[in-house]
UniProtKB/Swiss-Prot annotation:
Organism this protein belongs to: Trametes versicolor
Transmembrane stretches, start-end: 24-44, 52-72, 97-117, 122-142, 148-168, 185-205, 217-237
Protein name in UniProt: Protein FDD123
Keyword Membrane found: yes
Domain of life: Eukaryota
UniProtKB keywords: Membrane, Transmembrane, Transmembrane helix
Topology with respect to the bilayer: Multi-pass membrane protein
Signal peptide positions on this chain: none
Cell location: Membrane
Family: Belongs to the archaeal/bacterial/fungal opsin family.
Matching InterPro entries: Arc/bac/fun_rhodopsins, Yro2-like_7TM
């Protein structure tokens, strides 16, 4: 049985996704799905208190799986009049921007938590990633030349992200030592290069309408796979031997259930209940 996604969900624009493009998106969805299941299984091999980075990866891969399922099904797009290509409309995939709105800040958070950056620096960097995504979406939805103004705002935010990843972050103190610093520098350089390619893809696709929607899907799909599953597997592998206690990421929320089981004296109210601290703070 062939791919009938476009028959069940007909395209809603002049320049739209092809069946071959949908086939590629199903393949990308499979990559995200298999990666998600792998990370979930990997997470359960980690002790409590050493799962935070794996759980962030689960959120990223779950979001990516949902987005690619939607796009492969030809859902999550809206028609917008084209620029530089005569008459007609082009499918703008808002579901992709929803994906990036969630995943880009989390990918940066995954990376920056390994550094000695302050929470205020991390928060500002995550905000700039949100600015990057939102300005890209607004620019894609604007049919006039004003879209390039939003594009400029987004690229400006990207320069700030590069500054933090490539300069500010590496010059902080890494509590986990030089091994993690080396891994961070490799991961930060890798992610920064990928972030350079996204605005180029946008200018050729939603911005200038130079490439087809199917070519757009292939380009973005490759970038998302390299920025999602491949990046996350590399980063988690680099963290496999690191003592999570050095990060100081204790939430204080998790406590053994036994701590809530009062003895007879506590139940009678004669002895104050105490909270076990041995397992507190695991995330």
């Amino acid at each position: 049985m062939g791919n009938s996604a476009l028959d069940l969900n007909p395209p809603n624009a002049t320049f739209h996704l092809s069946t071959h493009g949908s086939d590629w998106l199903w393949a990308a969805f499979s990559v995200f799905g298999v990666s998600l299941l792998t990370v979930v299984a990997w997470t359960f091999t980690r002790p409590r208190g050493a799962r935070l980075f794996h759980q962030i990866a689960i959120v990223v891969l779950t979001t990516g799986s949902l987005a690619y399922f939607s796009m492969a099904s030809d859902l999550g797009a809206t028609p917008v009049p084209v620029e530089f290509r005569g008459e007609g409309t082009r499918q703008i995939w808002f579901v992709r921007y929803i994906q990036w709105f969630i995943t880009f800040p989390l990918l940066l958070l995954e990376l920056l938590l390994a550094t000695g950056l302050s929470l205020s620096d991390i928060f500002t960097t995550l905000f700039m990633s949100i600015v990057l995504v939102i300005t890209g979406l607004v620019a894609a939805l604007v049919p006039s030349t004003y879209k390039w103004g939003y594009y400029t705002f987004g690229v400006s935010a990207l320069f700030y992200i590069w500054y933090v990843l490539l300069w500010h972050g590496p010059h902080t103190t890494f509590a986990a030592g030089g091994v993690l610093r080396r891994g961070y520098i490799l991961a930060a350089g890798y992610l920064s290069f990928l972030l350079l390619l996204y605005p180029i893809a946008w200018a050729c696709a939603e911005g200038g309408n130079v490439i087809s929607v199917t070519s757009e899907m292939i380009w973005y799909g490759i970038l998302d796979i390299f920025a999602g599953p491949i990046f996350l597997f590399f980063f988690l592998w680099e963290l496999r031997g690191v003592d999570y206690a050095t990060f100081g990421l204790h939430s204080g929320k998790y406590t053994d259930k036994s701590a809530y089981a009062p003895n007879t004296a506590q139940a009678a109210g004669t002895v104050p209940a105490t909270t076990s601290t041995g397992a507190a703070g695991n995330v």
